[in-house]
């Protein structure tokens, strides 16, 4: 049912003309494409979308990396969304992702740890757990997940006000 597919492409205004032209030249069949510039979002001015951190690494300074935490605000009419990062290469039909039973979870994601192996991507590699307030809230050995492909239950996210929870963690 390709006509029911809607791709929301989010980008910086600098890239908007090139991406728009690419989709004009390469239309996605019967699917719809909405291309949006994050520079036009009202919500970005009311949130501190990334911490000041003296880093020039775009993984930590680009607003695009923080968008997933604001999806319920960006798409208030949507209840569920499959998020694919810019570097994901799709090799098969992803429609079954839509039918995954999330068992009450807000996020469905690909884990980065394999059973029986030493975890390579643990939470303590990404979060400073030396602060006791933060350290007691997280399991240092917990595995992280791959950010490249996620399924979000936006209704549940809104119900639990998780954007506010995320904002609180940023302030710590």
For the regions a protein language model found, what residue spans apply to each?
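Glycosyltransferase catalytic domains, chiefly GT-A lineage
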Residues: 1-172
């Amino acid at each position: 049912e390709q006509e029911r597919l809607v791709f929301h492409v989010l980008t910086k205004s600098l890239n908007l003309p090139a991406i728009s032209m690419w989709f004009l030249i390469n239309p996605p069949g019967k699917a719809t494409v909405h291309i949006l510039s994050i520079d036009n979002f009202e919500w970005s001015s009311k949130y501190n979308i990334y911490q000041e951190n003296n880093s020039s690494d775009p993984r930590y300074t680009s607003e695009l990396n923080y968008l997933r935490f604001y999806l319920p605000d960006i798409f208030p009419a949507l209840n569920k969304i499959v998020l694919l990062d810019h570097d994901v290469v799709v090799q098969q039909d992803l429609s079954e992702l839509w039918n995954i039973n999330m068992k009450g979870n807000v996020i469905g994601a690909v884990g980065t740890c394999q059973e029986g192996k030493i975890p390579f991507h643990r939470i303590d590699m990404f979060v400073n757990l030396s602060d006791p307030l933060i350290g007691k809230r997280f399991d240092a050995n917990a595995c992280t997940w791959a950010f490249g492909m996620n399924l979000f239950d936006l209704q549940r996210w809104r119900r639990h006000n998780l954007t506010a929870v995320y904002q609180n963690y940023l302030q710590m």
